[in-house]
């Protein structure tokens, strides 16, 4: 029956939408990559032929191609694989049955009847249900029809009963393009409406009016398929049909939604283009309307940028808003938000002006009687405002020259502004409508604007000699009634009220200040171009900008009317209360305290709280009327804004009501804050606070940790305090559920004392609001106090304590009382209080000598709890003291530079406030030796030491005499010190101990040294201070560091007569004065330097006890000495033979050789920098110099040293910067191309292995779904930028396996196809070496893994195409990538993000901050290098667990599990490692070098004597003209790149002893002379001869409790081209060399000390980073040390002398090193030059010296 039915209706099959697809589903397992080109061409030809047959078939039998229909006839052509839909989505007999249509019988086809599709059929019945249309169906869409339109009628209006009918209905046009689909749908909907099917069309809500019948659904489906061929359907329509090929209703519904959206978009665009605004409606409503339109358009894909939006908005502004059109010139990139700020400001100004019209508007009669010849003028000496405006400017200028007390007569309208209004525009916004917050000025300062004035702007005046302004709110440092006479152009006087500074903050973030005069008697604010020119600012009227002489644009100029203006938004408003200008002669006795002063005095409390406190007498000594409150409302404290910045406030009323029924001190709230990071061990990291519910009295206690015993001690203390002081018993303590409160110890304590613990519910912070708000308030105050005072962060708890004292004394607005009053205590006497951080001078009652200064500069912290004194911080002594012997330092405000506090001098206010208290102190002073009470428990700084269990060092300190003589202790007799800002040093030694603050009476006697550095013509010599004597200045450091168990210094004292010295005269270069210094043996000098703290400035203390002082050896110093000796003992330093008595002592090493002939470019540099090279010039023996290399050495003859003159110009000299990393050198190509490995490879066996590797790679790519295998793209149809060339590379690995890799040519990838900001991270070599070293010391298992095809696990976001592999023979086709293919720019970054996410989320790892690709958890450390993983763990099962997790996602291979206890060999990132757990580790590259070096074509000498050193001292690179042809030059450069590339790779891996030679030769890669090549050959020869050398590590002693990280530094002064110095550093962890660096100094040093400072400063950042890494990977404490052989450098670093350095660059480096040493527990050691292994990094050494320095760590 089915076949008969098909044949019966075969004559109308042309009208169906059936596709010619086989009745069977085609199944194939054939890989698309294996399809040959011939088969593909046959398939395409067959498909083309079939399509042409269908095209030529008559209309009556034509069947459009549609893959969504099953054809009742078998197809004669196999389906194309590259169709618009995937093959598996094409309709088959088993897939064609639509849901709900089973009653039609056959499941393989959609039934249809003749009446549904025949154009001549009329259905039976009285009326025709479906329309008929002519046989010429399918007119193109471009053909207009009378019934087709661009709009459609809502289907709801159609007749649902379908009673009306049309005899003929014009069919819709044929769809010919996907872009025409929206218009076609409109005609199709019109066609359905005309066909009486309007009721089935979805309405605006997506639902039809009536239910569609089956016949109607069939008609709808078939007509849609006829007139909308599948190849022209949009993608979203195809997506719908791929799910349900009959769901035409969903397509219509989506189309209607899109048309509605398009209509809304069109309406929005029209509305936006026709905006109008004149202020008649609120600005908020206008902004909401505009922003909603813009947001809708952006969401719909129509992007409206800021420039277009601002233009559309400004075009519709009128009235007083019209002038905003011209603000576009001042902002090239104005945003919509900024424009609406302007509109809001004007709108608010309009509302304010309307509410106060009687105050500003003038009567109409006044306007008529107004005269322009008023006596007061506005323009001082103005001849022409803008020289460019010569025409039509006379009347405007004349108008500007006169003052009017009211508005001028209206003028005619022009293009630049709307018609003048009767109301002036008042602009009070301090940023010219842009800076947000308004400054409300008093009525006196308001001035009516002229009708031709641009509000909020300054008029540029080229003829005015002074700048005048009407408003006083932009005047800084104002002084009233200045004696200044100003006249206008008509010689008439202009009264001036004040003079001050006008400060600008331009758009290049620079600040400039000019003088300004204040007068309200002008019509414009005038900005003098002459004064701007004085500060290097000119006005360019061609570009309409203010700019500097170098062309830097500062601000735009706006042309308005006939004048030019600059916006006031660049003016900085004054942050202080402007003094009353007209009241100058105010009596001193009646002058009130300014509010900013009181605000800062009372811990930055708000004005309301302070006023309540003064009203209720909780603050005594003065009344509320004594404070000037005029500026309290508008005053903004910058420190409060920074320190108290919050997100939102806590929710109030969260506590239970019953808590109010408790008596005082019965109900407490407590909470713990912390930790505070990056603090010294002596400073607390936490504090615990308590608040009484009834009185709101607060207590705070410092904590170092949150242990149970620490918390219990605090609870015991506060309960005893409340019981004894207030006779109250605590009943309830409310706290959160932290472990510090819920532990069993505290719970038993509370239970024993009868106290009920009240815990908050989980995650209910609101129930703990009292304690939370207190902590927030105290922290706000703390940040503000530290910000205001500039004190270091380790004093943070002192700020908390100060704030607590003040907060307990301030009245609550609710209770009208302070916490002290509620508790029954007296109010706080403010005369006893100093601002936090107030500079003071503390009296030293026991100075070093009678001639030493008696004052020590300090900073007041807070009143003492235990005495009438004050807690004061002394930076020079690193102490806090409790004393009454201090005097306030006048004129010193410790402020930050970014705020203008220069004008905030409250000296007189502070003197008046503390006068009575100072007199009380003066009359009751007790001259006793214990005035400085250091044993009080005032705060944590005096009570807590680094190691309290160790005996305290009572050695005293000397006060540095560098400070100026302090003022007298009597305030009334002291003179005002010059007002320069003094800030507390932020970076000082924060370690505070309980040792004595002032020096003891026993002193060590040492001579005074004043001359530190000689700066003669040579700049060579530095007087070695530590040689002469141990500095007394070291006393300054000794007591503060005595408590450190890890300190590198000792406090031993030596007498000047302890040994017999011989005076040796030393003359400084270029000078005539001779210094007589004692000659000291090297051994004694070394001992003194290591155990002393040398300094630049030393003070000679008195010695009254004896001439011979025995060193004081306390247990602390002995412990320090043991620590020092243990660190030095761990280092691989050479063992020196006994020195000859003829050798000179070490001080002379600092003397560089004085030689009149010296080259500027050398491999060996100046040679040995020791003084004996110059003083006693000895030629080394032949065996020290010979290097037996049997290749050409014609150019290696030793040349006479040339003079120190700049090199002559050369025809070809190419010098590059020193090599910073291995990747900067062009690597050697070790891979083969496809033709080399397969096509032309004559080695059959090797070829077969490469072919096998080739197929293995292709199969792996297919397995990983690297590209889309369903479709191939024509090369001509793809954007060339997205096409990436591909290639196969082949190589043979060291294990003998042959590998093939199919890669993309990322080197020619277009920048638009990848994100340039993405980074491909790999593990840093220092991180790997650190991990290996820690593994050896901790007996870790080392497991090596490899992830196969790592990059292919990462998806690719971009649309990229590559050429198929060559075996497919599809050269003109492309395939689209789906994975991050090898070679792409973004592949590495994509893989890194993928594996990083997996390790963190699935493996429980976390990445170490600052060290990419280093992951850790509590048991395992992972170092990741692309697809290689190195796992370190003490438990091998932990490694296995990670491996199991990785195998779930990635193809993970275990290269080496590392479970054996015997020696295990690894090949990790090129390093050949031999590791025996718990014993040793050896790192080398013997196998790799044996394979690679012979391939370099270097003339090796395998039979001759081996080289003993990589280079010869004294040989210099001759930089004469290099004249070779271009081809030979390129060839030699290429050869140098290969040689230095390999040498760099080896050197930075483990051969750190070669880095100097590598770095020097790398600078000459582009200067390949014969001599440079020979030296390079010699370096490669030495590498070949020593290829079996290894970096040797031995396990650290198990008794060592700490990790020891040491950097050894050295520098060779002036031995590089252009007088640059070579610097080098070696880094050691627990005595194992883990890295090295040799480079040329970036700055030109003028002395050896500068070179050494440069070298040390280069090592400090890496030293700190390595320290952080070690602490993250291993939780043991760490000691950081610096070793150098320059005593003068150590003296400078440890000195406290802050005098100006000779060179600001090195002065900055020296000061930074001081901060590192004093603040970060970084210790500096002295090391003998002969033991300095970093010497190999800076100069070529003789063979014996080279071997001596390297044989202990590499052999």
Swiss-Prot record:
One of its GO terms (cellular component) is cytoplasm. Pfam families: rve, RVT_2, TYA. Mg(2+) 2 binds at residues 1346, 1427-1428. Residues 1338-1476 form the Reverse transcriptase Ty1/copia-type domain. The keyword Acyltransferase does not apply. The modification Phosphoserine is found at residue 416. Keywords: Aspartyl protease, ATP-binding, Cytoplasm, DNA integration, DNA recombination, DNA-binding, DNA-directed DNA polymerase, Endonuclease, Hydrolase, Magnesium, Metal-binding, Multifunctional enzyme, Nuclease, Nucleotide-binding, Nucleotidyltransferase, Nucleus, Phosphoprotein, Protease, RNA-binding, RNA-directed DNA polymerase, Transferase, Transposable element, Transposition, Viral release from host cell, Virion maturation, Zinc, Zinc-finger. Residues 1610-1752 form the RNase H Ty1/copia-type domain. GO terms for molecular function: aspartic-type endopeptidase activity; ATP binding; DNA binding; DNA-directed DNA polymerase activity; RNA binding; RNA-directed DNA polymerase activity; RNA-DNA hybrid ribonuclease activity; zinc ion binding. The capsid protein forms a homotrimer, from which the VLPs are assembled. The protease is a homodimer, whose active site consists of two apposed aspartic acid residues. Residues 583-640 are annotated as: Integrase-type zinc finger-like. This is Transposon Ty1-JR1 Gag-Pol polyprotein. Retrotransposons are mobile genetic entities that are able to replicate via an RNA intermediate and a reverse transcription step. In contrast to retroviruses, retrotransposons are non-infectious, lack an envelope and remain intracellular. Ty1 retrotransposons belong to the copia elements (pseudoviridae). Transmembrane segments: none annotated. Residues 1-93, 126-173, 352-421, 956-1087, 1092-1111, 1130-1186 are annotated as: Disordered. The C-terminal RNA-binding region of CA is sufficient for all its nucleocapsid-like chaperone activities. Residues 48-60, 127-152, 1005-1015, 1054-1082, 1101-1111 have a biased composition (Polar residues). It comes from Saccharomyces cerevisiae (strain ATCC 204508 / S288c). Initially, virus-like particles (VLPs) are composed of the structural unprocessed proteins Gag and Gag-Pol, and also contain the host initiator methionine tRNA (tRNA(i)-Met) which serves as a primer for minus-strand DNA synthesis, and a dimer of genomic Ty RNA. Processing of the polyproteins occurs within the particle and proceeds by an ordered pathway, called maturation. First, the protease (PR) is released by autocatalytic cleavage of the Gag-Pol polyprotein yielding capsid protein p45 and a Pol-p154 precursor protein.
């Amino acid at each position: 029956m089915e076949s008969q039915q098909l044949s019966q209706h075969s004559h109308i099959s042309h009208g169906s939408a059936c596709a010619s697809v086989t009745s069977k589903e085609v199944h194939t397992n054939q890989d698309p990559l294996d399809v040959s080109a011939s088969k593909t061409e046959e398939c395409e030809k067959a498909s083309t032929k079939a399509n042409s047959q269908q095209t030529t078939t008559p209309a009556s039998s034509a069947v459009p191609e549609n893959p969504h229909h099953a054809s009742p006839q078998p197809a004669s052509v196999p389906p194309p694989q590259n169709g618009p839909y995937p093959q598996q989505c094409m309709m088959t007999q088993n897939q064609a049955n639509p849901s709900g249509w089973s009653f039609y019988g056959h499941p393989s086809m959609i039934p249809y009847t003749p009446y549904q599709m025949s154009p001549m059929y009329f259905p039976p019945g009285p009326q025709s249900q479906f329309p008929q249309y002519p046989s010429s169906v399918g007119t193109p869409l471009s053909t207009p029809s009378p019934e087709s339109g661009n709009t459609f009628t809502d289907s709801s209006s159609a007749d649902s009963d379908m009673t009306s009918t049309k005899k003929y209905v014009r069919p819709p046009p044929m769809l010919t393009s996907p872009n025409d689909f929206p218009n076609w749908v409109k005609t199709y909907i019109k066609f359905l409406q005309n066909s009486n099917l309007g009721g089935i069309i979805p309405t605006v809500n997506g639902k039809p009016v009536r239910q569609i019948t089956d016949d109607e659904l069939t008609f709808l489906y078939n007509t849609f398929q006829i007139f909308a061929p599948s190849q022209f359907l949009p993608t979203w329509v195809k997506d719908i049909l791929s799910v349900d090929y009959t769901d035409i209703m969903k397509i219509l519904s989506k189309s209607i939604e899109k048309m509605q959206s398009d209509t809304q978009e069109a309406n929005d665009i029209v509305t936006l283009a026709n905006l109008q605004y004149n202020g008649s409606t609120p600005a908020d409503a206008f902004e909401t309307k505009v922003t909603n339109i813009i947001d809708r358009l952006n969401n719909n894909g129509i992007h409206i940028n800021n420039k277009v939006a601002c233009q559309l908005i400004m075009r519709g502004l009128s009235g007083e808003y019209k002038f905003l059109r011209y603000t576009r010139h001042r902002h090239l990139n104005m945003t919509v938000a900024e424009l609406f700020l302007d509109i809001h400001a004007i709108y608010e100004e309009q509302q304010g002006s309307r509410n106060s019209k009687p105050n500003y508007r003038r009567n109409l009669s006044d306007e008529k009687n107004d005269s322009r010849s008023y006596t007061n003028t506005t323009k001082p000496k103005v001849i022409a405002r803008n020289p460019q405006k010569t025409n039509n400017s006379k009347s405007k200028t004349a108008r500007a020259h006169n003052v009017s007390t009211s508005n001028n007569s209206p003028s005619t309208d022009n293009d630049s502004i709307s018609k003048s209004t009767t109301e002036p525009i008042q602009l009070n916004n301090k940023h010219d409508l842009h800076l947000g917050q308004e400054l409300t000025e008093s009525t006196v300062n308001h001035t009516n604007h002229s009708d031709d004035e641009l509000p909020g702007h300054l008029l540029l005046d080229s003829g005015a000699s002074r700048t005048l302004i009407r408003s006083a709110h932009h005047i800084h440092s104002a002084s009233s009634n200045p004696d200044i006479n100003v006249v206008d152009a008509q010689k008439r006087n202009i009264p001036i009220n004040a003079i001050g500074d006008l400060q600008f903050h331009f758009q290049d973030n620079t600040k400039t200040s000019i003088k300004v005069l204040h007068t309200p008697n002008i019509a414009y604010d005038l900005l003098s171009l002459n004064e701007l020119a004085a500060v290097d600012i000119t006005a360019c009227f061609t570009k309409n900008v203010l700019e500097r002489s170098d062309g830097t644009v500062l601000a735009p100029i706006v042309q308005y009317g006939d004048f030019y203006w600059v916006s006031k938004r660049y003016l900085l408003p004054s942050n202080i209360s402007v003094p009353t200008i007209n009241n100058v002669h105010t009596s001193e006795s009646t002058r009130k305290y300014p509010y900013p002063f009181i605000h800062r005095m009372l811990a930055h409390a708000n004005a309301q709280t302070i006023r309540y406190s003064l009203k209720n007498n909780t603050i005594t000594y003065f009344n509320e009327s004594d404070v000037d409150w005029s500026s309290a409302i508008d005053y903004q404290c910058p420190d409060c804004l920074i320190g108290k910045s919050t997100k939102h406030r806590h929710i109030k009323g969260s506590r239970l009501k019953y808590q109010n029924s408790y008596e005082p001190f019965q109900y407490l709230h407590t909470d713990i804050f912390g930790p505070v990071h990056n603090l010294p061990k002596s400073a607390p990291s936490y504090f615990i606070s308590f608040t009484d519910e009834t009185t709101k009295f607060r207590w705070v206690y410092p904590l170092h940790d949150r242990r149970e015993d620490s918390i219990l001690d605090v609870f015991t203390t506060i309960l005893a305090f409340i019981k004894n002081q207030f006779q109250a018993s605590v009943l309830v303590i409310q706290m959160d559920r932290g472990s510090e409160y819920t532990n069993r110890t505290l719970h038993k304590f509370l239970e024993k004392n009868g106290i009920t613990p009240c815990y908050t519910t989980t995650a209910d912070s609101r129930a703990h609001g009292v304690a939370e708000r207190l902590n927030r308030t105290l922290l706000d105050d703390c940040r503000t106090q530290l910000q205001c005072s500039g004190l270091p962060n380790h004093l943070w708890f002192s700020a908390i304590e100060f704030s607590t004292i003040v907060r307990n004394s301030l009245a609550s607005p609710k209770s009208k009382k302070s916490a002290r009053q509620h508790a029954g205590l007296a109010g706080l006497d403010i005369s006893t209080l100093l601002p936090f951080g107030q500079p003071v001078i503390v009296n030293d009652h026991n100075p070093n000598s009678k001639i030493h200064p008696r004052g020590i500069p300090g900073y007041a912290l807070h009143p003492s709890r235990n005495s009438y004194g004050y807690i004061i911080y002394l930076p020079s002594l690193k102490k806090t003291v409790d004393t009454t012997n201090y005097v306030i330092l006048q004129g010193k405000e410790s402020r930050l530079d970014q705020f203008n506090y220069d004008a905030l001098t409250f000296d007189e206010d502070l003197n008046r406030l503390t006068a009575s208290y100072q007199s009380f102190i003066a009359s009751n002073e007790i001259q006793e030796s214990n005035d400085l009470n250091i044993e009080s428990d005032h705060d944590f700084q005096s009570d807590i030491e680094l190691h309290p269990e160790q005996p305290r060092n009572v050695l005293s300190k000397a006060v540095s005499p560098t400070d100026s003589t302090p003022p007298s202790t009597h305030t009334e007799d002291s003179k005002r010190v010059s007002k320069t800002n003094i800030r507390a040093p932020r970076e000082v030694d924060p370690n505070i101990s309980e040792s004595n603050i002032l020096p003891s009476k026993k002193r060590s006697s040492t001579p005074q040294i004043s001359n530190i550095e000689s700066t003669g013509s040579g700049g060579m010599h530095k007087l070695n201070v530590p040689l002469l004597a141990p500095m007394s200045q070291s006393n300054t450091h000794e007591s503060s560091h005595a408590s450190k168990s890890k300190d590198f210094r000792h406090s031993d004292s030596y007498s000047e007569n302890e040994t017999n010295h011989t005076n040796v005269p030393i003359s400084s270069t270029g000078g005539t004065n001779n210094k007589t210094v004692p000659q000291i043996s090297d051994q004694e000098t070394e001992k003194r330097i290591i155990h002393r703290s040398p300094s630049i400035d030393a003070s000679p203390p008195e010695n009254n006890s004896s001439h011979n002082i025995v060193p004081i050896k306390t247990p602390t110093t002995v412990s320090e000495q043991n620590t020092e000796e243990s660190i030095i003992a761990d280092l691989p330093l050479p063992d020196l033979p006994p020195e000859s008595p003829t050798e000179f002592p070490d001080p002379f090493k600092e003397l560089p050789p004085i030689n009149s002939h010296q080259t500027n470019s050398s491999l060996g540099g100046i040679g040995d920098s020791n003084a004996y090279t110059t003083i006693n010039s000895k030629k080394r023996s032949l065996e020290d110099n010979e290097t037996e290399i049997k290749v050409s050495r014609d150019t290696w003859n030793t040349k006479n040293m040339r003079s120190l003159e700049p090199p002559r110009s050369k025809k070809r000299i190419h010098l590059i910067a020193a090599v910073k990393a291995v990747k900067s050198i062009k690597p050697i190509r070790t891979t083969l191309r496809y033709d080399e490995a397969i096509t032309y490879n004559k080695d059959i066996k090797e070829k077969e292995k490469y072919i096998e590797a080739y197929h293995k790679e292709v199969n792996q790519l297919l397995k990983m779904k690297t590209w889309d295998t369903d479709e191939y793209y024509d090369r001509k149809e793809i954007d060339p930028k997205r096409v990436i060339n591909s290639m196969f590379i082949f190589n043979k690995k060291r294990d003998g396996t042959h590998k093939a890799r199919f890669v993309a040519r990322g080197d020619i990838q277009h920048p638009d196809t990848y994100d340039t900001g993405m980074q491909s991270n790999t593990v840093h070599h220092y991180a790997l070496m650190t991990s290996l070293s820690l593994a050896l010391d901790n007996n870790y298992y080392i497991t090596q893994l490899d992830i196969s095809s790592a990059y292919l696990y990462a998806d690719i976001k971009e649309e990229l195409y590559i050429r198929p592999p060559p075996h497919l023979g599809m050269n003109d086709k492309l395939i689209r990538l789906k994975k991050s293919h090898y070679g792409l720019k973004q592949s590495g970054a994509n893989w890194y993000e993928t594996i990083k996410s997996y390790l963190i989320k699935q493996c429980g790892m976390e990445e170490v901050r600052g060290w990419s690709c280093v992951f850790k958890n509590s048991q395992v450390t992972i170092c990741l290098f692309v697809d290689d993983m190195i796992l370190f763990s003490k438990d091998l099962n932990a490694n296995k667990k990670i491996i199991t997790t990785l195998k779930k996602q990635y193809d993970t291979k275990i290269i080496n599990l590392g479970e054996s206890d015997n020696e295990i060999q690894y090949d990790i990132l090129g390093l050949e490692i031999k590791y025996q757990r718990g014993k040793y580790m050896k790192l080398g590259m013997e196998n790799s070098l044996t394979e690679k070096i012979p391939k370099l074509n270097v003339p090796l000498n395998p039979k001759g004597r081996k080289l003993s050193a990589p280079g010869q001292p004294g040989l210099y690179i001759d930089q004469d003209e290099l004249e070779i042809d271009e081809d030979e030059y390129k060839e030699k450069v290429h050869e140098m790149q290969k040689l230095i590339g390999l040498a760099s790779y080896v050197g930075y891996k483990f051969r750190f002893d070669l880095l100097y030679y590598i770095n020097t030769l790398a600078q000459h890669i582009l200067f390949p002379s014969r001599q440079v090549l020979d030296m390079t050959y010699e370096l490669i020869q030495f590498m070949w001869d020593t290829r079996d050398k290894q970096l040797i590590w031995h396990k650290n002693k198990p008794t060592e409790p700490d990790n020891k990280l040491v950097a050894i530094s050295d520098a060779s002064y002036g031995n590089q081209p252009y007088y640059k110095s070579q610097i080098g550093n070696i880094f050691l962890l627990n005595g194992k060399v883990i890295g090295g660096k040799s480079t040329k100094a970036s700055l030109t040093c003028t002395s050896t000390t500068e070179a050494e400072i440069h070298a040390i400063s280069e090592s400090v950042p890496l030293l700190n980073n390595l320290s952080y890494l070690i602490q993250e990977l291993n939780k043991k404490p760490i000691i950081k040390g610096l070793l150098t052989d320059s005593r003068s450098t150590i003296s400078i670093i440890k000195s406290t002398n802050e005098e100006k350095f000779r060179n600001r660059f090195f002065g900055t480096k020296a000061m930074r090193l001081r901060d590192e040493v004093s603040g970060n527990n970084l210790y500096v050691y002295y090391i003998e030059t002969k033991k300095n292994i970093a010497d190999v990094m800076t100069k070529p050494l003789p063979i014996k010296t080279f071997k001596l320095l390297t044989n202990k760590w590499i052999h």
